[in-house]
Amino acid sequence: MATRGPAGLGADDAERGAGPTVRDATEDDLAAIVAIYNAAIPGRTATADTEPVTVESRRAWLRERDVGRHPVWVCESEGRVVGWLSFGKFYGRPAYAATAELGLYVEPGARREGVATRLMKQAFARGRGLGLDTFLGFVFAHNDASIALCRRFGFETWGHLPRVAVLDGVDRDLLILGVRLGDRSSED
């Protein structure tokens, strides 16, 4: 069941019967959020973390967010959290207040089922209402699926940091993908 949180998410999807719903994350969702994140670590494509994180380490991360500008949303299907999206502060300085770094993770069993697309559509639909005008994604250059998702939503490569990460002894490049919300011309 979708619930209405500070950002007012969830009710519109549920009322339309549109499948999975997107809603504000709560502390009750932390176990699922952490499990989904930790499932991404072994693949070495979606995060620079190399060891699992704990629910307790994420509790402060969730509590300290300004949900009016930098919320965490979960995508729920059949009562189960199958993905999540976070809006992170970019660089933490006032001049960057309208820019957010997006983090998006999907449960392995729910990948390629439209979960990431649903979360991204919500981000674009509600981003301006959060006071945001620019989204950034920091994506490993070998993460083809995330790059393709971002490209579908109009993200362009704004930076390329060669060999800045070492994962299992392999140097990895990091791409900075960006989009201005008013410039978006693809995925509706």
Question: Predicted segments — roles?
Answer:
Residues 86-89, 94, 136-139, 151, ...:
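Conserved catalytic-core motifs of GNAT/GCN5-like acyltransferases
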Residues 21-33:
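A short beta-loop-alpha structural element at the N-terminal edge
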Residues 34-62:
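Conserved GNAT-fold acetyl-CoA-binding loop/helix
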Residues 20, 80-84, 172:
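Glycine-rich phosphate/pyrophosphate-binding loop shared by adenosine-nucleotide-utilizing enzymes
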Residues 112-125, 147-152:
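Conserved acetyl-CoA-binding loop-helix of GNAT-fold acetyltransferases
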Residues 52-109, 120, 126, 180-182:
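Acetyl-CoA-dependent GNAT
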Residues 111, 137-147:
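Conserved beta-strand-loop-alpha-helix junction that forms the acyl-donor binding cleft
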Residues 127-139:
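Conserved GNAT acetyl-CoA-binding A-motif
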